[in-house]
């Protein structure tokens, strides 16, 4: 027995099991769950683009960024946002799935809201409507503000207000200089919010907005969130909304996990029954596969959906299939009279191309599903499948192979029967170097 090789093998086992047990649960909790596993709201919007100008890649990217900022203000993250073709009116459609949101109506109002803030130097009363309307171009708009608006209480008046800061402090300085001891008019979504008199020149670019309906902290917080999110590049019209309760999502997750655990336990048992010690090594490699897959999901911020979880479990079968191909090649070499170590080396080498070819075809199928799948569930399944294939190649082809070669080199177990060979094919003898 070669103790150095045996200790190296045991070190591999300890590292895999240690990392999985100590950090695996934390990694699992860090992976964002999709709508079908956590509950939430599914919203379908029609995008009001100018006539003759359909939504292009630049417009889509700007719209996605604006929606993401609004979703983040709800206290949740990782929304699934994707184009859904066009409706009967020829309008582009965009679907927004927000998992974990507690207040569905709040999500609808926040995502579709557009806070159009504008500051004018003059205003008048419209004789037809009797409302105060702005005159001339705006002195500044919400686009001139930093994304750090927040609720404050005015220290002098005690009123609720929204603190704002200009990106270019000199702009606010020039406005306050120009309108010193004169009123300015702050409009929100076309309605006059307040018309304070400028009492001093502001040099810091900071100011406060109060008045109108900004009488409560929540109203100020809502306006601050809308200002921070910025204006939507295109108006959105809500066409449909579907909610998934958190209980239903939790039930789906629980049942899928139970099915996955049963499948993994049966696979582990089969590998040990069929390949004995080699099967146990394959099981340890499968643990490494699961750990690395979850780590990849967390690192890439992949939203785990029910279909993605199914693909993750399917990936276990793909990973173990690579081990089975390798072990059957090793058994063939043992039947041909090769020594155990020689059979392991040659068997791994002969199985490599078969494993790569089979995984490549599955990966191509997953890639096609991702490109042409369209629906979020199909794309989620495809992403999880492709990640699983890549990780399985690393664990089954490289890691499991390294473990098996190290263990056979240790000569702790020399009988080929412990590596899946039928009893009596080769008599127990010392492995040749």
Curated annotation (Swiss-Prot):
Subunit structure: Forms a complex with SecF. Part of the essential Sec protein translocation apparatus which comprises SecA, SecYEG and auxiliary proteins SecDF. Other proteins may also be involved.
GO molecular function, one term: protein-transporting ATPase activity
Membrane-crossing residue ranges in chain numbering: 7-27, 257-277, 278-298, 300-320, 354-374, 380-400
Cellular compartments per GO CC: plasma membrane
Family affiliation: Belongs to the SecD/SecF family. SecD subfamily.
The keyword Transmembrane belongs to this UniProt entry's keyword annotation: yes
Localization annotation: Cell membrane
Biological processes annotated in GO: intracellular protein transmembrane transport; protein targeting; protein transport by the Sec complex
Annotated keywords: Cell membrane, Membrane, Protein transport, Translocation, Transmembrane, Transmembrane helix, Transport
Topology of this chain in the membrane: Multi-pass membrane protein
Disulfide topology: none
Function: Part of the Sec protein translocase complex. Interacts with the SecYEG preprotein conducting channel. SecDF uses the proton motive force (PMF) to complete protein translocation after the ATP-dependent function of SecA.
Listed Gene3D superfamilies: 3.30.1360.200, 3.30.70.3400, Multidrug efflux transporter AcrB transmembrane domain (1.20.1640.10)
Protein name from the UniProt record: Protein translocase subunit SecD
Primary localization class, coarse: membrane
Source organism of this protein record: Alicyclobacillus acidocaldarius subsp. acidocaldarius (strain ATCC 27009 / DSM 446 / BCRC 14685 / JCM 5260 / KCTC 1825 / NBRC 15652 / NCIMB 11725 / NRRL B-14509 / 104-IA)
Leader sequence residues: none
Matches recorded under InterPro entries: Acrflvin-R, SecD, SecD/SecF_arch_bac, SecD_1st, SecD_SecF_C, SecD_SecF_C_bact, SecDF_P1_head
Coiled coil: none
Pfam family, one: SecD_1st
């Amino acid at each position: 027995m070669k103790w150095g090789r045996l200790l190296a093998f045991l070190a591999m086992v300890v590292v895999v099991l240690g990392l999985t047990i100590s950090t695996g649960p934390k990694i699992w909790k860090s992976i964002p769950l999709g709508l079908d596993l956590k509950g939430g709201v599914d919203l379908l919007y029609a995008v009001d683009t100018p006539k003759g100008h359909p939504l292009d890649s630049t417009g889509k990217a700007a719209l996605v960024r604006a929606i993401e900022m609004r979703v983040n203000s709800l206290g949740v993250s990782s929304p699934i946002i994707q184009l859904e073709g066009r409706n009967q009116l020829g309008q582009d459609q965009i679907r927004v799935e927000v998992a974990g949101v507690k207040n569905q109506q709040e999500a609808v109002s926040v995502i579709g809201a557009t806070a159009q803030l504008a500051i004018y130097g003059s205003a008048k009363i419209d004789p037809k409507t009797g409302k105060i309307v702005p005159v001339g171009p705006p002195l500044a708009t919400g686009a001139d503000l930093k994304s750090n608006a927040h609720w404050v209480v005015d220290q002098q008046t005690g009123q609720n207000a929204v603190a704002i800061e200009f990106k270019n402090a000199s702009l606010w300085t020039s406005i306050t200089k120009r309108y010193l001891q004169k009123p300015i008019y702050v409009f929100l979504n076309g309605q006059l919010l307040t018309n304070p008199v400028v009492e001093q020149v502001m040099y810091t670019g900071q100011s406060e907005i109060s008045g109108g309906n900004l009488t409560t902290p929540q109203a100020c917080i809502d306006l601050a969130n809308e200002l921070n999110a910025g204006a939507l590049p295109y108006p959105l019209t809500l066409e449909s909304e579907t909610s998934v309760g958190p209980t239903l999502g939790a039930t789906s997750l629980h049942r899928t996990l139970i099915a996955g655990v049963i499948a993994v336990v049966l696979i582990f048992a089969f590998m040990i029954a069929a390949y004995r010690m080699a099967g146990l090594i394959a099981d340890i490699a499968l643990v490494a596969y699961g750990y690395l897959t979850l780590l990849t999901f967390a690192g890439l911020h992949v939203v785990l959906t029910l279909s993605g979880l199914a693909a993750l479990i399917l990936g276990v079968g793909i990973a173990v299939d690579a081990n089975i191909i390798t072990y059957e090649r090793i058994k063939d070499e043992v039947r041909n009279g090769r020594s155990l170590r020689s059979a392991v080396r040659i068997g791994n080498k002969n199985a490599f191309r078969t494993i790569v070819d089979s995984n490549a075809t599955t990966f191509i199928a997953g890639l096609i599903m991702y490109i042409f799948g369209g629906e979020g569930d199909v794309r989620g399944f495809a992403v999880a499948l492709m990640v699983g294939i890549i990780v399985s190649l690393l664990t089954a082809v490289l890691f499991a192979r390294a473990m098996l070669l190290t263990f056979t080199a240790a000569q702790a177990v020399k009988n080929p029967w412990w590596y899946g060979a039928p009893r009596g094919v080769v008599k127990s003898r010392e492995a040749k170097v």
